[in-house]
Amino acid sequence: MVLTGPLQRESVSMAKRVSMLDQHKKSSCARVRVAVRLRPYMDEKDEAKATTVCVRGLDSQSLEIVNWRNQLETMQYQFDAFYGDSASQREIYMGSVCHILPHLLIGQNASVFAYGPTGAGKTHTMLGNPNQPGVIPRAVRDLLQMSRTAASAPENENWTYTINMSYVEIYQEKVMDLLEPKNKDLPIREDKDHNILIPGVTQKMINSFADFDEHFIPASQNRTVASTKLNDRSSRSHAVLLIKVQKSQQVVPFRQLTGKLYLIDLAGSEDNRRTGNQGIRLKESGAINSSLFTLSKVVDALNQGLPRIPYRDSKLTRLLQDSLGGSAHSVMITNIAPEQTYYFDTLTALNFAAKSKQIINKPFSQETTQTVVQPAMKRPREETGHIAGSQKRKKSKNDSTESSPNSSMDTAGKQKLNLATLDPAVVERLLKLDKILTEKGKKKAQLLSTPKRERMALLKKWEESQMEIERLKEKQKELEQKAMEAEARLEKSNNSDLSDSSVSENTFRAPLRGRNTSTAKVKKVLRVLPMQGNSQLQSTVEEGIPVFEKKKKKKQVTCEGLENQPTWEMNMRTDLLESGKERILKLLNTGSVKELKSLQRIGDKKAKLIIGWREVNGPFKNVEELACLEGISAKQVSSFIKANIMSSIAS
């Protein structure tokens, strides 16, 4: 950029930064090429056109714009190409785009994207119209022609070319498929070779330009557009057309070269004070401006050589990662408007373009090789002498156990595999295994070469460690036996304490009949744990209030030769049950949330539900009415009553 005028003449230079890439990839540097296209004046009949134009072209590479700080000065910009308002679509395509297409046939990536404010003509540059086709139809037509010409060349007799297309839009930070709209946000991923891809996106094979038209025209109608004060058909999303060219070899080693062409029509930055956006238009504008701001941050980070490039801060920059500082031949067509009302939008676009042309990419060919795996040849088994052969193998096996390890290693070393017939992954694993075995063999050799005195010391130390382990195991068994005996004594003492307690026969009745010892499985009998204590039970008995009554005695027929094992079921006294229900009912009708939560199995949610039901339907008539509440069954009410009555007795 150069400032010119009667008072000042100054030149400003921009810093350069080479993008970082994997060191093993040998590539040539390719700077991002920037072209600027000036849109024609919208109203040709405007008499004030001469005074309202703020941009003027100087030659085929430079232009000047009025300095807003000083109207007597102009700022000059120089780019790779400048196209005035009279330039045709063909001139722009032939001058800036067509030269990058041959790179696709050798497995390299390329990208062309249109940048600029809203209403500056980006979509017209990329799409055009039937009379003046834009960059996209011209590039696809030439690419199809180039692939047919290359396929018919004698040196490419064993090669085939296939071309696929995908078409997506980035609308409000969502990647949407335009070929088959699914209203689904597609993810953006990066493979092990640092290639950006979109899993699940629709791909269509195209063999002719008619196939391309058949898929592209309906998909373009699916793109989101709307009307604003500055543009009747304003793009509300970033559109990305991906053309993938694959060159495949039909003979060994089956090489495959893959080149990708990104044709990107960016949505324009918008000043909502001038566009009058409201509602959904305002939300769309915010998403567009945010992604373009992230794009400017990426360019600044590349120029300043920052360690972190914010590609992942936006779906747009993530998708453009190959185009800016990556591995693609990139061309940016900056569209600007000449009107004075677009002055600051034009100035911002020119500054962004000046920074972008300093970015340097490192393109390289994407090549893969497929290895044919031949089936392993099996030796036919001899029918005669089979028994003798097996005996011979057994004898050789016994002999090998008596021989030294070195002899076995020598025998294994004589058997060699034909690595050329194996899968590369298998070969790699075999080489790693061979390396491990070699290292282990060296360690064994070192052990055998150890002096006799040191070897005897090592063996003695090993025997001592084994004896120590055995001693620790015996000690552990003794400790376990003592622990089991202590537990048995404790259980016996607890049972004797329970038998000596003053619990009367009328209060608790337990089966006291003798039992024959047997290995048959007997029914479990309820017992009181020691930690519950005897004081509470004894105090209850001393008051003369029996808590449980014997309900019914049942006998169960056991295995033959055994006595019948009696079992008991306990039934709670009716007066205690009724008094407990009255206490619970009173608390249900008068208690607060905190008081209700003191009941067993009543939490915050159920307590609020009880109070709400009480306010609508009045007090509960009985506790069983809890089953009328939503989410509480009659079975839950029964267990709730038992739990609270037992809790009151225990307390």
Curated annotation (Swiss-Prot):
Which intervals carry biased composition (Polar residues)?
Answer: 401-410
Q: Which InterPro entries match?
A: Kinesin-like_fam, Kinesin_motor_CS, Kinesin_motor_dom, Kinesin_motor_dom_sf, P-loop_NTPase, RuvA_2-like
Specify one Pfam family: HHH_3
Provide the record's note on post-translational modification.
Answer: Ubiquitinated, leading to its subsequent proteasomal degradation.
Q: Name one GO cellular component term.
A: microtubule
SUPFAM superfamilies per UniProt: P-loop containing nucleoside triphosphate hydrolases, RuvA domain 2-like
Q: Which GO terms describe its molecular function?
A: ATP binding; ATP hydrolysis activity; DNA binding; microtubule binding; microtubule motor activity
Q: Where is this motif: Important for regulated proteolytic degradation?
A: 561-564
Compartments, as annotated in UniProt: Nucleus; Cytoplasm, Cytoskeleton
Any one biological process term the GO annotation gives: microtubule-based movement
Could you say which residues bind ATP here? 116-123
Name the principal localization, coarsely classed.
Answer: nucleus
Disulfide bond residue pairs:
none
Record-given protein name? Kinesin-like protein KIF22-A
State the organism of origin. Answer: Xenopus laevis (African clawed frog)
